[in-house]
């Protein structure tokens, strides 16, 4: 019998999407080192719409603990400055013309532990998303088998493949989390 209409590559793509979202979220966590991705979640009210910071300015890292934001439009400097202040990143920009300089302060141990907890929360959300994709895949397989388009042997084989993909993706999430945790806790 055929394996019906089951697309394993789509399932893996959806699982990798959860990993991608996790990496984006973890990239926004401040680790004590300057990173241009730290400012990625910030949006600015510009030209009548909300725009990401990287569409109104260039973010660079001139030093290990310094971010430089070069705003392209002089009229947008105050809006960018306000958005950075209001972003809950704990950063206070120093404005010099169209350039905003952001000193990244040292993190104390308590704040590092809080960031680790946030990272764990993000990772758990990614794992839940992967498990949802797994459940959707398994439900689809069972439906295809129930409709008679797949043999029970094919169901077992594909179920194992789905579980293997799930396990690999969760291992990747754990590895990504461990890497970020190490980065956060390193002084």
UniProtKB/Swiss-Prot annotation:
GO molecular function: ribosomal large subunit binding
A single BP term in Gene Ontology: cytoplasmic translational termination
Keyword Cytoplasm found: yes
Keywords: Cytoplasm, Protein biosynthesis
Disulphide-bonded residues: none
Pfam (any one): RRF
InterPro entries: Ribosome_recyc_fac, Ribosome_recyc_fac_dom, RRF_sf
Principal location: cytoplasm
GO CC annotations, alphabetized: cytosol
SUPFAM superfamilies: Ribosome recycling factor, RRF
Lipoprotein is among the record's keywords: no
Annotated compartments: Cytoplasm
PANTHER family: MITOCHONDRIAL RIBOSOME RECYCLING FACTOR PSEUDO 1, RIBOSOME RECYCLING FACTOR
Stated family: Belongs to the RRF family.
Function: Responsible for the release of ribosomes from messenger RNA at the termination of protein biosynthesis. May increase the efficiency of translation by recycling ribosomes from one round of translation to another.
NCBIfam families (UniProt xref): frr
Protein name: Ribosome-recycling factor
Organism encoding this protein: Xanthobacter autotrophicus (strain ATCC BAA-1158 / Py2)
Name of the gene this protein is made from: frr
